[in-house]
């Protein structure tokens, strides 16, 4: 890392959000508390630690904050790929506030949040046009993205391997009506992948999410113009992938953007902070507000605007069923979150360290 003042133009090339020093009060306060420290971005996250960078070409292994090593330290308060940190030599001394993020409820019975990526402009939700194609899973990803401040874009790969790409787009037309961009492409073809260029401009950061075998690593290699990321095929019987990406990593692209590739995720649990309207269901939520009863379950109640829309072929009944399922999951997670916050507030009086829950603002 450099021992002089920050080189902000170079930092901008890896996603620094301003042309000079930080302009947000919360960031200024952290800088003021660590006047000898320099900013860097987390570009890799491993079980054993982090790799950070302050230029597109140079990176180093970083020593994390001691409290991050404690087993009970909240995982979402540790640094994630895309986070900005302050460094003194090789030591991380502070985590800067997140401007955006995508999170999920971590696997297990106890309530935990896991940050998938931080300080991102765009989330590419990648799904293959083979047996991997699953509109319900796409909707689940959209729910996790909604409210986190980033722009979702649905990317349908393997368009060269099917004659039914237009049919798949038609299935998702209710999403496109909500201004959620959809792109069907061949992840191996640079001309086809150029459809993503509007979201990969200089200084912007995007993250790829999706199941194993969806084509995320292939897409990364095409955007890089080189075979940097290892790729494997998928099993022919079910089109399931083999986890070619094993850790999250931030990669500078020739376009000037940064791309975060992530391992495939089998479990996509809500955190309880999601907004269904912002998470791809604004049309269903708007109709639900017109139902005769405030607690309408949208099953057989009189005056149900949602059922009326289904019967008029204006809404996909399977999508509405998924909406209702996700609504229950979000409510359940919100109850667990409220319990956790209450426990933390009680911990303040007992001298225990409370675990805050970050809520990124929209950029």
UniProtKB/Swiss-Prot annotation:
<keyword id="KW-0963">Cytoplasm</keyword>
<dbReference type="GO" id="GO:0005737">
    <property type="term" value="C:cytoplasm"/>
</dbReference>
<keyword id="KW-0479">Metal-binding</keyword>
<protein>
    <recommendedName>
        <fullName>Small ribosomal subunit biogenesis GTPase RsgA</fullName>
        <ecNumber>3.6.1.-</ecNumber>
    </recommendedName>
</protein>
<feature type="binding site">
    <location>
        <position position="304"/>
    </location>
    <ligand>
        <name>Zn(2+)</name>
    </ligand>
</feature>
<keyword id="KW-0547">Nucleotide-binding</keyword>
<keyword id="KW-0378">Hydrolase</keyword>
<dbReference type="GO" id="GO:0046872">
    <property type="term" value="F:metal ion binding"/>
</dbReference>
<dbReference type="InterPro" id="IPR004881">
    <property type="entry name" value="Ribosome_biogen_GTPase_RsgA"/>
</dbReference>
<keyword id="KW-0342">GTP-binding</keyword>
<dbReference type="GO" id="GO:0005525">
    <property type="term" value="F:GTP binding"/>
</dbReference>
<keyword id="KW-0862">Zinc</keyword>
<comment type="subunit">
    <text>Monomer. Associates with 30S ribosomal subunit, binds 16S rRNA.</text>
</comment>
<feature type="binding site">
    <location>
        <begin position="210"/>
        <end position="218"/>
    </location>
    <ligand>
        <name>GTP</name>
    </ligand>
</feature>
<dbReference type="InterPro" id="IPR030378">
    <property type="entry name" value="G_CP_dom"/>
</dbReference>
<comment type="similarity">
    <text>Belongs to the TRAFAC class YlqF/YawG GTPase family. RsgA subfamily.</text>
</comment>
<dbReference type="InterPro" id="IPR027417">
    <property type="entry name" value="P-loop_NTPase"/>
</dbReference>
<keyword id="KW-0694">RNA-binding</keyword>
<feature type="binding site">
    <location>
        <position position="296"/>
    </location>
    <ligand>
        <name>Zn(2+)</name>
    </ligand>
</feature>
<dbReference type="GO" id="GO:0042274">
    <property type="term" value="P:ribosomal small subunit biogenesis"/>
</dbReference>
<keyword id="KW-0699">rRNA-binding</keyword>
<feature type="domain" description="CP-type G">
    <location>
        <begin position="112"/>
        <end position="268"/>
    </location>
</feature>
<dbReference type="Pfam" id="PF03193">
    <property type="entry name" value="RsgA_GTPase"/>
</dbReference>
<dbReference type="InterPro" id="IPR010914">
    <property type="entry name" value="RsgA_GTPase_dom"/>
</dbReference>
<dbReference type="GO" id="GO:0019843">
    <property type="term" value="F:rRNA binding"/>
</dbReference>
<feature type="binding site">
    <location>
        <begin position="157"/>
        <end position="160"/>
    </location>
    <ligand>
        <name>GTP</name>
    </ligand>
</feature>
<feature type="binding site">
    <location>
        <position position="298"/>
    </location>
    <ligand>
        <name>Zn(2+)</name>
    </ligand>
</feature>
<feature type="region of interest" description="Disordered">
    <location>
        <begin position="340"/>
        <end position="363"/>
    </location>
</feature>
<keyword id="KW-0690">Ribosome biogenesis</keyword>
<comment type="function">
    <text>One of several proteins that assist in the late maturation steps of the functional core of the 30S ribosomal subunit. Helps release RbfA from mature subunits. May play a role in the assembly of ribosomal proteins into the subunit. Circularly permuted GTPase that catalyzes slow GTP hydrolysis, GTPase activity is stimulated by the 30S ribosomal subunit.</text>
</comment>
<feature type="binding site">
    <location>
        <position position="291"/>
    </location>
    <ligand>
        <name>Zn(2+)</name>
    </ligand>
</feature>
<dbReference type="GO" id="GO:0003924">
    <property type="term" value="F:GTPase activity"/>
</dbReference>
């Amino acid at each position: 890392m450099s021992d002089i003042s920050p080189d902000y133009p170079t930092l901008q090339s890896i996603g620094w959000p301003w042309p000079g020093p930080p302009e947000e009060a919360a960031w200024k306060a952290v800088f003021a508390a660590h006047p000898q420290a320099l900013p860097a971005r987390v570009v890799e996250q491993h079980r054993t630690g982090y790799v950070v960078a302050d230029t597109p070409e140079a990176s180093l292994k970083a020593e994390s904050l001691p409290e991050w090593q404690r087993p009970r330290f909240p995982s979402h308060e540790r640094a994630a790929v895309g986070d900005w940190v302050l460094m003194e030599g090789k030591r991380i001394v502070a985590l800067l506030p997140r401007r955006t993020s995508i999170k999920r409820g971590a696997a297990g019975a106890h309530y935990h949040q896991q940050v998938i990526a931080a300080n991102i402009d765009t989330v590419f939700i990648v799904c293959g046009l083979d047996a991997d194609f699953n509109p319900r899973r796409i909707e689940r990803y959209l729910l996790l993205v909604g409210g986190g401040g980033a722009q979702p874009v649905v990317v349908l790969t393997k368009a060269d391997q099917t004659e039914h790409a237009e049919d798949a787009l038609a299935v998702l037309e209710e999403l496109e009506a909500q201004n959620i961009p959809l792109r069907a492409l061949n992840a191996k073809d640079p001309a086809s992948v150029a459809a993503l260029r509007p979201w990969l401009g200089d200084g912007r950061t995007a993250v790829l999410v999706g199941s194993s075998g969806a084509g995320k690593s292939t897409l990364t290699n095409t955007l890089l113009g080189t075979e940097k990321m290892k790729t494997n095929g998928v099993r022919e019987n079910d089109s399931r992938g083999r986890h070619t990406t094993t850790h999250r990593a931030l990669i500078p692209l020739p376009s000037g953007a940064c791309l975060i590739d992530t391992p495939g995720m089998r479990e996509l649990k809500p955190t309880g902070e999601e907004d269904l309207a912002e998470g791809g269901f604004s049309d269903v939520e708007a109709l639900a507000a017109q139902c005769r009863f405030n607690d309408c379950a949208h099953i057989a109640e009189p005056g149900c605007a949602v059922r009326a829309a289904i019967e008029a072929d204006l809404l996909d009944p399977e999508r509405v069923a998924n909406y209702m399922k996700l609504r229950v999951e979000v409510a359940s997670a919100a109850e667990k979150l409220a319990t956790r916050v209450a426990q933390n507030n009680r911990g303040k009086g007992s001298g225990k360290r409370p675990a805050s829950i970050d809520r990124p603002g929209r950029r």
